[in-house]
Amino acid sequence: MSAWVLPDHIADVLPSEARHIEELRRGLIDTARGYGYELVMPPMLEHLESLLSGTGEALDLQTFKLVDQLSGRSIGLRADMTQQVARIDAHLLNRSGVTRLCYCGPVLHTRPDRPRATREPLQFGAEIYGHSGMEADLESVLLALDCLHLAGVEGVSVDLSDARVVRTLLEPIAADSATVRRIYAALAAKDASELSQASAGLPSGTRRALSAVLELYGDASVLDEARTALSDVAGVEEVLANLKSIAAHLEGRTVSFDLADLRGYSYYSGARFTIYARNATDAVVRGGRYDEVGAAFGRTRPAAGFSLDIKQLVGIVPPRTLKAAIRAPWAATPDAHRFIAQLRSAGETVVCVLPGHESQVQEFQCDRELVLEQGQWMVRPLPY
């Protein structure tokens, strides 16, 4: 095999795409900062018990594992940064009030999580800790929408759900983990036949409720249908009222509901949201509430947030037009260097043509040139 061939679903990022990614990264972090979120940078690898605490089987299978040559302990390359940020909040910051944190960095997956996806996403996310009310859920949705607007994503729609509905149905019956996984998979896939088989050993009331949940997706009328179909489910009124309140603050946006949407990581414990875009084949943002995510670190705190893959956004958003550069001759004189430095300080891109390469095509598009006229350096338009 050729030495330059990369593993499947791993790719180099070339200059034009790298510029686009970096512009989005800066813009997303600045947008989060505008809401008061502080940037943190967790490490690329951690001990497995820290990375995978409370995350479920799906994330375990997505995590690359190896042995630390220093300690002999098992460590993993992160597949998701949510647990890492929860650890930072719980032990390193240890604040008592509301804490807002954001992050951006590469994660690694053993398998792509969607068709044609990279196994090295560039994950951006934001988390708010310390507030259990609907306001934190809503802020997460609004920040995610503002991030997509900044990126130029069009045709956005929001899908709302809540992990407590199905969890409340299954908790009293103590179903085994294999059955629970089958039920969750059937609900996520909207597979009525598989759901019927997976829930065959459950009480009849639970089976009826699960079958009802499978059909509870669509516009706001779904909430009224859920009140009737799930009237015997404890806490369902609170769940539905919370979803209705979040949707009310998203007036003017396309909002739908899907009480069987259980896709994504298993640590969600309350309201969830998924954001879709016109040109994307899969969700561009997943988020919600995960109050139990810090329990493994000895400090359970209310938490809500979201994450997205910047590389996925690059595939659906056209890059901004690159400002044309100034072409300059190579001039080893102090006055030329000073003038070029002034131009660069003013935000201009100045590309110096190295000796012997004057006739070669430049990597940057140039529409002006630096010339020396009557002993003075000046910028003039390139003749075409």
Swiss-Prot record:
Q: Name one Pfam family in it.
A: tRNA-synt_His
Please tell me what else the database record remarks about this protein: This function is generally fulfilled by the C-terminal part of HisG, which is missing in some bacteria such as this one.
The molecular function terms in GO held by this entry are: histidine-tRNA ligase activity
Q: How does it assemble?
A: Heteromultimer composed of HisG and HisZ subunits.
Q: What is this protein called?
A: ATP phosphoribosyltransferase regulatory subunit
Identify the metabolic or biological route this protein is part of.
Amino-acid biosynthesis; L-histidine biosynthesis; L-histidine from 5-phospho-alpha-D-ribose 1-diphosphate: step 1/9
- Presence of keyword Cytoplasm: yes
Keyword terms of this UniProt record = Amino-acid biosynthesis, Cytoplasm, Histidine biosynthesis
Q: Does the keyword Cytoplasm apply?
A: yes
Protein family membership: Belongs to the class-II aminoacyl-tRNA synthetase family. HisZ subfamily.
Cellular component, GO, one term: cytoplasm
Q: What does this protein do?
A: Required for the first step of histidine biosynthesis. May allow the feedback regulation of ATP phosphoribosyltransferase activity by histidine.
One of its GO biological process terms is: histidyl-tRNA aminoacylation
Q: Provide the gene name from the record.
A: hisZ
Broad class of the protein's primary localization: cytoplasm
Question: What compartments host this protein?
Answer: Cytoplasm
